[in-house]
């Protein structure tokens, strides 16, 4: 039978062939049975095989019938559907003829669609997929793409013949195939014809009439097409063309039923806009799409998305060729016409930029558009501009009715975000914020996105003045960042100029035009605009200035500038005087600018113009142009284009007599160049002299401006160039008469420092700031030229150099007498004289270098003499006068001896190096430790001597050792100043502090036998008694007690805490006390020692450096001493009386009022005591009289008592002397008093001295006069010339004149004559002692006794710093009534200013500044005092001590806010130099205290200052453990006190606290900023800031995100995180590098996946809420890291404070961070920008390498159950995936099918 059927198939007759097919099917049914279904596992019979074979037959009838037979078998239930379907698909790849199979396949699919659609049991869409299982037609097309015509044919029939009731099913069953055909990413060309042809079939309406009712098939098909549209590719020309055809067909189909498809039409309108942009870029054509948009305007009406389309039109117009613009302009006009009678949308103003660009374009473009119908582009543009100008603009507060979930391109995201930003920046504060953020980012980008530019142009057009300057500034910076925007900007500026504005705004806009000339291409357009302005006569002056500004940007404009300047010179009768004046001013200003900007290129061209202006402008009211061109001349001279001297020679005939203030001011400024242009010629030096004379003359000009300019110019000259001849005559010092000078001497014309200060008295208040600047230059120059050695010598102490020949000869005289003496009785006196003045000359070679051999010999001589003096100096406890000065004599001698021996040691080492006995390294080491070697050598020698010798030797040894301790300590301090405060520790030598402690402990053990020292002792000075106590001789105890006063400078430097201990010890041993010494002499010396100790503390100004507790202790000790002094029942209180005298004398110079009152009361008490002392011993009276003389002199010199009271006491002493002529103490006291009062200007005292001196000399030189009478006269004589001046701390320099020198020389000659001639041993011995004492007191400067000098008297007389400090002292003594604060400030400010850069030479700054701080000089003086203390604290312990007092309560509470702010900010400079207690008090009572308010800081500036100081202090290198702990604790406390919610104007506080935390360890940071419910916002901000700066790794954000998910205001935290992530990208740090960011983002994606699939637990928050927040953070990271375009639009900034200092404390600045409308929009629009940014990010390295991971993650998150993830978020993920459809990784079928939902 099969053979028969085969024959029939071959028979060429269709009827026979059809019958054969019927027979074959019957055979198949027979073979398989009627009841059994044919399926896959059924035996393949011959008939069945033949049937399958003939389905591919060459005969069309056979294959068609066979295929239909197979379908019939399925339809009748004889074969399974899947069997036949799979059989057809299996035959597809190899079949010769496919028509039958495809037809059968279509029949099967139709059958399946009908069956499944009717049953409704199974969703038809679930039957097939694109990939698994694939829709059968996909398989066919993939295997046989050549069969597309057959497919098209059958598909056409399929859709046309589809029953109405199954239309939806038929479309659904074809949906996978259609998705594959149109949306497959590769978009194969071989399918193109099928796609295009099939589209017409799909969208063909069912009815004949277009108005027919919408069929189900049509509805389903259009819905399918609309859903496919976002997935279509538009990568190349072919794809874009297909997309355009596709969207046109779909759009036209939708338009047939616009009412039904209103929503889709609205969405498709926006899609059309996006396609237009892509089409423009690829094809250059989009007019057909624009026509579609036009059609939908009428149809959609109010539902048309006008705002978004208008923004899109504006963007398209900017990038569209002119030929394409007309349809868009028509569309825009139609859109705006819809709103007639209503407010047009605010967004419509964005059209202005392209419209103005069209209007400003050339006519050439219109020539190219010839033949077009209707209005031209310019006419349309003009119509639109008119509409925009006439109509009012709406608020656009309504929301967009339709929002695209899946836009076809990124344009939609930009449009929508721009619309949102536009909506929110209408408010002034939001505008300012957005502009500030844009401004901060312009430096990071070179391409400005057009929508950002449009928004800026909108703001420029709409602004009414509030933000105009900011807008114009951003405009200028935008032009610099992207010069391609300039042509668009210029028409907008011109448009703005055409609107009504205030004159200032017009000016700002005009001067913005030249700043846009950033590229040569833009210059022509700007130049034309400026030239157009110049055609108006009233604007010619402005035009010239604009041209000059443009020339500054582009030198190529110079010819035009020259031409316009020449034209402006031409006289014009039509122009008024006012306009001529403006032109002249403009010309002069332009000349100045040309000279300043490019003096070398064009300066020479301007000389003629300068000369012309100077010649023309000679009248008083024409000074301004002349001054302007002189400024230009200033620039030419500065650039050395012209010679300043020659220039002045040419100008001086015209200008030397010019009295116009403005000209004089400008000339002074010109002359400030003279020092910097110096030429080494005589002519130039003469010129400089002329200039100086000119400037000094005009410092006294009555016009403050001229005088100020003169002083400012003088500040540029060297201080040495000013002479006393320059000074005004009123303040000029007396000049020496030339005839009185020696032949070799020249007249010294240098100005003493004090003379500069006299300028204060003749300077007008308004000129004082300029004088201050001049003083500052003097101070700075002096510090620059300050000799390095001055620091060393000042700390070391020294002698005055102004000694006469007679005084200088004393040491040699005593030395020769000592060496030739053969009388044992003279030995003690000679030893005393040697102690006071022994010194040997320094030996130097011809080149001024010391001779090493002789220096070594000098050192050995000093060593031998030291040991001899220890043995020979006589110590007698009963000699009270010598007891006062012996310690000081030893200190002066040991100072000379130590340095001489040290120099000798260094010289010996140099000799050893020269002779090769030592290597260079060994010598270098020994040189560096020589000062310690000398210390130890002398210590050994002194202690060895003291071990075996008498009590007198021990006493001298103690004084020598104590003096050595002082000298070594000072030397160490000077070394520290030389080595910037750091001395290398020497392991082979005992540290100085420990060695000094040994000396001190030894003294204390000797004074108090019960004292238990903590360290080692020098045991050679005492011995153990049987009871185990340390005992020493009375002389040793007395010497130890008085030696303690020598160590006061050491206590001040290193161990101030010992002061209290010593005061208590000495006070306890006063006469009459339970612990008083058994020895009467020791009791006397204890009182003297306490007085000496107190006097030295007063001399050190300890009360100015210490707190109230120390002052109370000093007064308590003084009270105890005075109690003993005035207690008549005590027998051995003469030492107390002397001690009181010494203490009160020094206390007189205190600035404390209570101290001065106390001195006055005690003086009167002493005077009364003297009156009542008739019954006392002669010694008692001598001591009392001497004490009275010292206190009286000091009190008078300090102004405590009047001249009359001093005269009364002087008369009382004179009477005593007359009645007791042989009493040395009385004569000494009277001489002392007369000298002191004379020095202080007491006339009667000077008269008395002139009478006493000759009478006493006569007594001394009278042969045979009684010895005691001569001795008294000798004491009186030396006192008359100041032998005891050191006790009273008088400045004897006041009478260092020739008359005083003559009197001094006369006394010295008298003493030497007594020593040489007298035969009385006792008289000779005393005379020698007195002569040495007089030498020391004449030469010594009291700075050698104090730890640091009390002032700068050791600086030369010409020193301005010395004079300034003297002025401070005067102010401190006389108060603000005598020294006005305004003048004091002029002197103090330079010292404070220069002190910031230099460390001043040593001085007791606490004593200098403390009175000024306490007296009522005002806040400014107080601050300057503290500024000096702060800057000098590193090198000045006294400054640090003063500062320490004022940074603690109670003093700190009395300071003003400004001073407190300064102390807070400057804390890093001084924190390491005050005590732990003081810095702790400062931190607790000020730094932390300012934050302690209920809700917000009461003084934001104070808080900010506190944090600035704290953050800088935490950066200090190597802080102490206490300081570091204190700072960390303060940081934590301040963080806790800051409000959780961050106000904008407080943001800097949080940044500052974050900077503080950044200095701590990670553990410390986490501990302080641990996130809790109450502090989450501030803790989050701090961590985010640290992450953004790279201080913390990005991975540390995990805990923050976990906490943030539970926070109710997540948007606030999201805003912070967004900014942090963006700034992490900008900051260059290892922790914020791109790989670290990639790692963190992948980690975040994993975290999100775990939460989505419930792998990671979350608490207190719904999963969908947590996922939404984390998706927002993911989007933030992607947007922040993809590019700068989206951040620029969104308002992200390059810093946390882009708006810094733009808003005051109120208004928008007070808003909470992250909560403003602008901030909310920023966060929300991050999601809109995600699809675009994700594509950009994955196209960059190294992100592109992880593209597959990102795609897989997006797919996995998108596919989680709906209830776990909101639909809106899923749409966002899908849109993001669709944006990646151009990437290679997306083209994998497994990827794109999942992305499309298949």
From Swiss-Prot:
Protein name as annotated: Focadhesin
Tissue expression pattern: Expressed by glial and neuronal cells in brain.
Any GO CC annotation of this UniProt entry: cytosol
Job of this protein: Required for the maintenance of SKIC2 and SKIC3 proteostatic levels in the liver. May be involved in the regulation of RNA degradation by the exosome complex. Potential tumor suppressor in gliomas.
UniProt key word Acetylation: yes
Record localization: Cell junction, Focal adhesion; Cytoplasm, Cytosol
Post-translational modification N6-acetyllysine, affected residues: 816
Keywords for this protein: Acetylation, Cell junction, Cytoplasm
Signal peptide: none
Assembly information from the UniProt record: Interacts with VCL.
UniProt xrefs under Pfam families: DUF3730, Focadhesin
InterPro entries the UniProt entry points to: ARM-type_fold, FOCAD/RST1_DUF3730, Focadhesin/RST1, Focadhesin_C
GO BP terms, alphabetized: regulation of post-transcriptional gene silencing
């Amino acid at each position: 039978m099969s053979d028969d059927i085969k024959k029939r198939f071959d028979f060429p007759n269709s009827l026979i062939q059809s019958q054969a097919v019927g027979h074959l099917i019957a055979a198949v049914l027979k073979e398989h049975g009627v009841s059994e279904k044919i399926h896959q596992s059924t035996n393949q019979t011959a008939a069945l095989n033949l049937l399958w074979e003939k389905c591919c037959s060459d005969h069309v009838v056979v294959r068609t019938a066979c295929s239909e037979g197979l379908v019939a078998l399925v339809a009748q239930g004889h074969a399974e559907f899947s069997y036949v379907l799979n059989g057809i698909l299996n035959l597809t790849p190899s079949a010769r003829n496919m028509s039958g199979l495809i037809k059968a396949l279509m029949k099967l699919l139709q059958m399946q669609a009908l069956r499944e659609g009717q049953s409704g049991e199974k969703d038809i869409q679930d039957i097939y997929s694109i990939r698994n299982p694939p829709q059968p037609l996909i398989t066919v097309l993939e295997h046989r793409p050549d069969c597309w015509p057959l497919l098209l044919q059958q598909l056409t029939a399929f859709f046309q013949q589809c029953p109405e009731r199954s239309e939806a099913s038929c479309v659904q069953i074809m949906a996978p195939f259609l998705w594959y055909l149109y949306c497959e990413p590769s978009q194969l060309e071989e399918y193109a014809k099928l796609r295009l042809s099939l589209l017409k079939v799909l969208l063909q309406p069912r009815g004949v009439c277009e108005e027919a009712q919408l069929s189900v098939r049509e509805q389903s098909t259009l819905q399918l097409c609309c859903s496919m549209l976002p997935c279509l590719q538009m990568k190349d020309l072919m794809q874009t063309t297909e997309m355009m055809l596709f969207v046109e067909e779909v759009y036209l189909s939708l338009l047939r039923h616009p009412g039904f498809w209103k929503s889709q039409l609205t969405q498709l309108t926006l899609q059309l806009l996006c396609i237009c942009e892509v089409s423009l870029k690829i094809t250059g054509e989009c007019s057909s799409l624009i026509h579609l948009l036009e059609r939908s305007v009428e149809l959609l009406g109010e539902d048309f998305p006008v705002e978004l389309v208008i923004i899109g039109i504006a963007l398209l117009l900017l990038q569209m060729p002119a030929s394409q613009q007309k349809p868009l302009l028509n569309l825009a006009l139609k859109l705006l016409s819809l709103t007639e009678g209503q407010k047009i949308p605010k967004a419509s103003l964005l059209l202005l930029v392209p419209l103005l660009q069209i209007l400003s374009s050339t006519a050439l473009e219109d020539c190219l558009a010839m033949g077009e119908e209707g209005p031209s582009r310019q006419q349309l543009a003009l119509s639109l501009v008119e509409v925009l100008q006439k109509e009012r603009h709406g608020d656009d507060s309504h929301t967009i009715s339709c929002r695209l979930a899946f836009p076809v391109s990124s344009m939609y995201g930009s449009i929508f975000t721009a619309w949102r930003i536009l909506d929110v920046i209408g408010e002034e504060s939001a505008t300012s914020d957005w502009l500030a953020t844009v401004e901060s980012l312009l430096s990071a980008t070179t391409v400005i996105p057009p929508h950002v530019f449009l928004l800026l142009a909108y703001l420029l057009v709409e602004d009414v003045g509030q933000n105009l300057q900011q807008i114009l500034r951003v405009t200028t910076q935008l032009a610099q960042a992207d010069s391609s925007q300039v042509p668009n900007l210029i028409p907008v500026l011109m448009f703005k100029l055409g609107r009504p504005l205030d004159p200032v705004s017009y000016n700002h806009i005009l001067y913005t035009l030249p700043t846009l000339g950033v590229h040569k291409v833009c210059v022509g357009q700007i130049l034309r605009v400026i030239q157009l302005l110049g055609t108006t006569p009233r604007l010619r002056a402005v035009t010239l200035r604009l041209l000059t500004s443009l020339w500054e940007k582009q030198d190529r404009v110079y010819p035009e500038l020259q031409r316009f300047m020449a034209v402006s010179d031409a006289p014009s009768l039509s122009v008024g005087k006012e306009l001529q004046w403006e032109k002249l001013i403009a010309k002069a200003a332009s000349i100045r600018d040309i000279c300043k900007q490019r003096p070398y290129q064009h300066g020479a061209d301007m000389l003629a113009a300068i000369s012309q202006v100077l010649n023309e402008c000679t009248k008083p009211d024409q000074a301004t142009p002349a001054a302007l061109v002189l400024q230009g001349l200033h620039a030419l001279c500065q650039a050395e284009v012209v010679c300043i001297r020659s220039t002045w020679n040419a100008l001086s005939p015209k200008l030397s007599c010019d009295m116009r203030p403005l000209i004089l001011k400008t000339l002074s400024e010109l002359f400030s160049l003279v020092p910097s242009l110096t030429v080494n010629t005589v002519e130039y030096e003469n010129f400089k002299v002329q200039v100086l004379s000119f400037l000094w003359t005009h410092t006294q000009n009555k016009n403050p401006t001229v005088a100020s300019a003169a002083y400012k110019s003088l500040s540029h000259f060297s201080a040495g160039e000013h002479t006393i001849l320059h000074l005004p005559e009123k303040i000029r010092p007396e000049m020496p008469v030339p005839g009185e000078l020696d032949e070799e001497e020249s007249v010294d014309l240098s100005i003493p420092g004090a003379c500069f200060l006299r300028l204060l008295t003749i300077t007008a208040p308004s000129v004082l700031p300029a004088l201050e600047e001049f003083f500052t230059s003097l101070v700075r120059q002096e510090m620059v030229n300050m000799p390095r050695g001055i620091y060393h010598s000042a700390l070391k102490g020294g002698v005055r150099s102004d000694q006469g020949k007679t005084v200088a000869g004393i040491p040699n005289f005593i030395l020769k007498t000592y060496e030739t003496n053969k009388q044992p009785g003279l030995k003690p006196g000679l030893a005393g004289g040697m102690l006071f003045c022994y010194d040997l000359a320094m030996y130097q070679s011809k080149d001024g270098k010391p001779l090493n051999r002789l220096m070594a010999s000098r050192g050995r001589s000093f060593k031998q003499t030291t040991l001899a003096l220890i043995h020979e100096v006589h110590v007698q406890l009963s000699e009270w006068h010598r007891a006062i000065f012996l310690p000081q004599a030893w200190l002066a001698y040991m100072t000379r001896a130590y340095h001489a021996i040290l120099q000798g040691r260094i010289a010996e080492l140099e000799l050893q190096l020269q002779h090769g006995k030592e290597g260079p390294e060994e010598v270098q080491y020994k040189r560096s430790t020589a000062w310690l070697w000398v210390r130890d050598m002398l210590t050994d020698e002194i202690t060895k001597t003291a071990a075996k010798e008498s009590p007198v030797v021990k006493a001298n040894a103690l004084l020598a050792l104590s003096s050595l301790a002082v000298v070594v300590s000072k030397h160490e301090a000077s070394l520290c100043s030389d080595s910037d405060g750091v001395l290398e520790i020497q392991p082979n030598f005992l540290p100085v502090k420990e060695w000094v402690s040994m000396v001190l402990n030894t003294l204390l053990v000797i004074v108090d036998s019960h004292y238990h020292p903590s360290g080692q002792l020098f045991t050679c000075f005492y011995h153990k008694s049987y009871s185990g106590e340390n005992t020493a001789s009375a002389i040793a105890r007395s010497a130890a007690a008085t030696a303690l006063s020598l160590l006061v400078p050491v206590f001040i430097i290193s161990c101030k805490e010992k002061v209290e201990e010593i005061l208590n010890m000495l006070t306890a041993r006063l006469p009459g006390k339970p612990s008083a010494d058994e020895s009467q002499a020791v009791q006397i010396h204890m009182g003297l020692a306490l007085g000496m100790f107190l006097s030295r503390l007063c001399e050190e100004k300890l009360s100015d450096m210490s707190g109230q507790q120390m002052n109370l202790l000093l007064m308590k000790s003084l009270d105890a001493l005075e109690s003993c002094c005035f207690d008549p029942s005590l027998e051995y209180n003469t030492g107390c009386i002397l001690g009181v005298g010494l203490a009160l004398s020094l206390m007189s110079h205190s600035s404390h009022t209570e101290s001065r009152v106390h001195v006055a009361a005690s003086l009167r008490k002493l005077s009364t005591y003297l009156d009542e002392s008739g019954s006392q011993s002669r010694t008692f009276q001598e001591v009392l009289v001497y004490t009275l003389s010292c206190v009286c002199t000091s009190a008078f010199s300090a102004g405590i008592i009047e001249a009359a009271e001093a005269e009364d006491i002087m008369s009382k002493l004179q009477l005593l002397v007359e009645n007791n002529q042989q009493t040395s103490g009385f004569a000494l006291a009277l001489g002392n008093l007369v000298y002191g009062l004379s020095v202080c200007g007491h006339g009667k005292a000077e008269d008395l001295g002139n009478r006493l001196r000759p009478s006493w000399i006569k007594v001394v030189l009278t042969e045979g006069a009684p010895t005691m009478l001569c001795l008294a006269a000798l004491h009186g004589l030396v006192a008359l010339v100041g032998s005891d001046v050191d006790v009273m701390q008088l400045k004897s320099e006041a009478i260092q004149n020739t008359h005083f020198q003559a009197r001094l020389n006369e006394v010295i000659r008298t003493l030497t004559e007594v020593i040489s001639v007298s035969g009385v041993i006792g008289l000779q011995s005393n005379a020698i002692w007195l002569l040495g004492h007089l030498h020391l007191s004449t030469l010594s400067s009291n700075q050698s006794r104090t730890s640091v000098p009390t002032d700068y008297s050791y600086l030369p007389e010409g020193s301005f710093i010395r004079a300034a400090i003297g002025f401070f002292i005067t102010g401190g003594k006389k108060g603000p009534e005598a020294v006005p604060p305004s003048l004091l400030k002029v002197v103090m400010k330079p010292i404070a200013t220069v002190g910031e850069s230099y460390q001043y030479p040593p001085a007791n700054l606490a004593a200098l500044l403390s009175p000024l701080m306490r007296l009522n000089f005002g806040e400014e003086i107080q601050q300057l005092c503290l500024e000096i203390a702060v800057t000098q604290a590193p090198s000045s312990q006294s400054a640090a001590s003063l500062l320490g007092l004022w940074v603690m309560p109670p003093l700190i509470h009395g300071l003003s806010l400004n001073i407190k702010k300064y102390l807070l900010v400057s804390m890093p400079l001084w924190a390491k130099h005050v005590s732990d207690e003081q810095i702790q008090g400062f931190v607790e009572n000020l730094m932390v205290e300012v934050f302690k308010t209920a809700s917000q800081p009461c003084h934001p500036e104070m808080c900010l200052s506190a944090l600035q100081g704290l953050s800088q202090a935490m950066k200090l290198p190597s802080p102490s453990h206490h300081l570091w702990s204190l700072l960390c604790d303060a940081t934590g406390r301040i963080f806790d006190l800051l409000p959780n919610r961050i106000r904008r104007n407080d943001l800097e506080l949080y940044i500052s606290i974050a900077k503080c935390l950044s200095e701590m360890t990670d553990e410390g940071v986490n501990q302080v900023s641990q996130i809790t419910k109450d502090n989450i916002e501030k803790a989050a901000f701090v961590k985010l800031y640290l992450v953004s700066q790279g201080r913390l790794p990005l991975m540390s954000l995990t805990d923050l995100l976990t906490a943030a998910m539970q926070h109710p205001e997540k948007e606030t935290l999201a805003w912070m995180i967004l900014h942090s992530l963006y700034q992490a990208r900008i900051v260059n740090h290892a922790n914020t590098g791109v790989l670290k960011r990639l790692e963190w983002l992948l980690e975040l994606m994993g975290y999100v996946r775990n939460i989505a699939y419930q792998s990671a637990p979350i608490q207190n928050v719904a999963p969908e809420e947590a996922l939404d927040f984390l998706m927002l953070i993911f989007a933030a990271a992607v947007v922040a890291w993809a590019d700068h375009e989206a951040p620029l639009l969104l308002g992200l900034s390059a810093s946390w404070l882009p708006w810094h200092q733009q808003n005051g404390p109120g208004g928008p600045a007070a808003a909470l961070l992250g909560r403003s409308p602008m901030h909310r929009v920023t966060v929300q629009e991050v999601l809109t920008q995600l699809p675009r940014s994700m594509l950009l990010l994955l196209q960059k390295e190294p992100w592109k390498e992880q593209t597959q991971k990102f795609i897989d993650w997006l797919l996995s998150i998108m596919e989680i159950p709906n209830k776990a993830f909101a639909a809106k978020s899923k749409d966002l993920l899908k849109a993001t995936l669709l944006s990646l459809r151009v990437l290679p990784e997306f083209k994998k079928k497994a990827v794109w099918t999942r992305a499309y939902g298949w």
